[in-house]
Amino acid sequence: GISLSGLASAVANEGGVGVISSAGLGLLYRNLSKDYIQASIMGLKEERCKAREKTKGVIGVNVMVAMSNFADMVKTAIAEKADIIFSGAGLPLNLPSFLQKDSVTKLVPIVSSARAARVITEKWHNLYNYLPDAFVVEGPKAGGHLGFKDEQINDEHFSLEHILPEVIDEVKDIETHYGKNIPVIVAGGIYTGEDIKRFMDMGAAGVQ
């Protein structure tokens, strides 16, 4: 696994947000438990602890909605006081339900459309009186489970350059309606400093 404590702490030490992937930890930590679910929980605790020993920076956890142990990983990340949970590969509609009164973890959905941002916001507010702390917007060139079709990958109508302004406009409406600042972070197919500047100039608050 690449997206574990080593990379996360290195990124955090450089001023970025270090992210630990929760996917497949039960396989990496089979020595701790023969039960995959339990090994995954113990593995996430171990990786979070290792990261914290190496940095005082921001450490987040990525938890995919599509994972069978989604709830266990979210609960563990919150209990371990992860700074942020990033969640995509589906709409994380029930993510705020796992927060406790003393929870410090911020919740950041990963979306690929303005509509997804609106649906998540309305659901979270109506059911949990909670609003996203930020959004990550991924285009078809991002690695992961995005739901884009093959023919859409190189279609400019589905490009990040096309999607980002739509999401930013949607989030501006959300900010105005609810009175909360919600940063929009852009991700997928961004390689160079020029790429970063281009998307920041378009209104992105950050780049992944």
Explain the meaning of each model-derived region.
Residues 1-178:
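Active-site entrance/lid segments in N-terminal catalytic domains of soluble metabolic enzymes
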Residues 133, 180-182, 205:
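Structural beta-strand/beta-sheet cores of well-ordered domains, especially the beta-sheet scaffolds
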Residues 136, 185-186, 208:
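Structured core elements
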Residues 142, 190-193:
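Short, catalytically relevant binding-site loops at active-site mouths
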Residues 164, 193-196:
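A general structural signal for well-ordered alpha-helical packing
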Residues 183-191:
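Glycine-rich beta-strand-to-loop/alpha-helix junction loops that act as flexible
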Residues 197-208:
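A compact, surface-exposed functional segment
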